[in-house]
A protein has these predicted regions:
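Catalytic cores of nucleotide-sugar-dependent glycosyltransferases that transfer UDP/GDP/TDP-activated
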Residues: 1-175
Length: 175
């Protein structure tokens, strides 16, 4: 069963909130609440998250509900957004602030771009509090590099199991 989250209009509003106030992941309250009511009806035994950024979920509502349900969560990570105060990737900027606490982000103009404020410190603190509030979560990075980074982050408190992205070896092969 596929459950849609919000509408295209909601995505646009969340994007505007991100651009103006650097609040990526803090919009879409109504869409997230509606989605969570659908999930609650299903009463799943486990929740499997992937990318939760993309202008469609309110991470506070999501993680507060996950905490109250107290069911296992598996979170597959495809990038670094979950443990930074702003960016999805930081290597190009040579930034390691996320290892202690993000602030004065050198990449506010990069996805998820903010034209206004730099809330990377507040975002970092909020993400850390929310994302480490669950009792039963396993982090699944899609590469060994990402697993090493996760273990240096606040998400390092959780079990971490790398499962690489699958590739078709009949099409792709070492050169």
């Amino acid at each position: 069963q596929t459950i849609s989250i919000g509408s295209q209009w909601d995505v646009y509003l969340h994007g505007i909130q991100t651009r103006l106030f650097d609040e990526h992941g803090f919009g879409s309250k109504k869409a997230t609440a509606t989605f969570l009511r659908h999930v609650e009806k299903i009463q799943p035994d486990i929740i499997h998250l992937h990318n939760i950024h993309g202008y469609y979920l309110h991470i506070g509502l999501l993680f507060e509900r996950l905490k109250s349900w107290n069911i296992p969560v598996v979170w597959t990570l495809h990038d670094c957004w979950s443990f930074t105060g702003h960016c999805a990737y930081y290597a190009a900027a040579g930034c390691r602030k996320w290892e202690t606490r993000c602030n004065d982000c050198p990449q506010t103009k990069v996805y998820p771009a903010s034209w206004g404020w730099d809330r990377s410190g507040k975002n970092f603190d909020t993400k850390k509090a929310l994302f480490t509030s669950l009792k039963h979560m396993t982090i699944v990075p899609v590469s060994r590099w990402l697993a090493r980074e996760v273990k240096k982050s606040f998400l390092g408190v959780y079990p971490c199991l790398t499962i690489g992205n699958g590739i078709d070896l009949s099409v792709f092969r070492p050169v």
